[in-house]
Amino acid sequence: MLTASNTKAPEQTKVIVGMSGGVDSSVSAYLLKEQGYQVEGLFMKNWEEDDTDEYCAASQDLEDAQAICDKLDIKLHTINFATEYWDNVFEYFLAEYKAGRTPNPDIMCNKEIKFKAFLEFACEDLGADYIATGHYVQRELRDNSWKMIRGLDNNKDQSYFLYTLDEAQLAHTLFPVGHIEKPEVRAIAEKAGLITHNKKDSTGICFIGERKFKDFLGQYLPAQPGIIESAEGVAVGHHDGLMYHTLGQRKGLRIGGLADAGEEPWYVVEKDLLRNVLIVGQGHNHPRLFSKGLIANQLHWVDRKALTSSIQCTVKTRYRQEDVSCTVTPITDSATEEYQIDFTEQQSSVTPGQSVVFYKDDVCLGGGIIDTLIR
């Protein structure tokens, strides 16, 4: 159980930093140590990889995290959250793909592992006052409540991935690099002699690493090959499984050499689950790529106050997208909590299973899962 937010001086305040072996968490630990906090690190193992797996960098990440903690003269704890990860993140990931949707496991990992399992373990078992992570996001106390604020570095802002956090979690979390731009973070690391200063940022889904996504997913879900049809209903190719494709996808469709097809590239515009057919259209302005709105469910508001009437705000339907103005309206006749989002301008490649995240200026209000599109 989380207690009231800490008011002790830094030297009396214990902070457990989630150490990933990357530069952002390294600098987070360094800055907190410089500010006088009692700092310890914690490395989470969330995936039971095959020891012979040449693609997995977990052991190198642990080695780097240990080297940073040794350099800073702080203790490094390690913990295995693989069971929690499998039950709460990976099974969700598989279920969504099986349902023909495109999930974002990083958001679920933040919700279930980093800001639930890790936060509870740090506070309850290690006696922490706070946890800290290397996320590019800020928190601010406004009107006596904690708000999630976009990271200063607009190119690295990670509030999109953290919309499930609530005020209690924000009250117990520090984001030491949220007010710093990425190049400066690397400069701080280099000046401090941290070996991660030039380490490449991790990309892709954590449990897949550098492996090919198609090969990995095929180990867990049986592929169901089928036909690719044009939006006009003409067969134009074959797919290896709908789960390997997402709306707006252009690459890897293997469509070509069709008479009278023209030169414009093909894009995925829909997935027909009942017929196991992938539907494609030509050109990035194909009308079936666009939506004027969406229905979202599984909503999380940072203040945990559900809407009772419409609001005007801005929204992102994918990471690093420019904000889009919209109206958010609760659907009162729905059996589950659902919201209708109407864009002021039509949006391309909005994808069911991905997250829609709401903003008011620099404040992240919350978000939810895209369920259906309004065209």
Curated annotation (Swiss-Prot):
Single GO MF descriptor: ATP binding
Spans annotated as Interaction with target base in tRNA: 104-106
UniProt keyword terms in alphabetical order: ATP-binding, Cytoplasm, Disulfide bond, Nucleotide-binding, RNA-binding, Transferase, tRNA processing, tRNA-binding
Region ranges (Interaction with tRNA): 156-158, 318-319
Cystine connections: 109-206
This enzyme's EC code(s): 2.8.1.13
Coiled-coil zones: none
Catalytic activity: S-sulfanyl-L-cysteinyl-[protein] + uridine(34) in tRNA + AH2 + ATP = 2-thiouridine(34) in tRNA + L-cysteinyl-[protein] + A + AMP + diphosphate + H(+)
Pfam families (UniProt xref): tRNA_Me_trans (PF03054), tRNA_Me_trans_C (PF20258), tRNA_Me_trans_M (PF20259)
One example of a Gene Ontology biological process annotation: tRNA wobble position uridine thiolation
Principal subcellular localisation of the protein: cytoplasm
InterPro entries: MnmA-like (IPR004506), MnmA-like_C (IPR046885), MnmA-like_central (IPR046884), MnmA-like_central_sf (IPR023382), Rossmann-like_a/b/a_fold (IPR014729)
Ligand binding (ATP): 18-25, 44, 134
Role of this protein: Catalyzes the 2-thiolation of uridine at the wobble position (U34) of tRNA, leading to the formation of s(2)U34.
Family per similarity comment: Belongs to the MnmA/TRMU family.
Protein name according to UniProt: tRNA-specific 2-thiouridylase MnmA
Gene label: mnmA
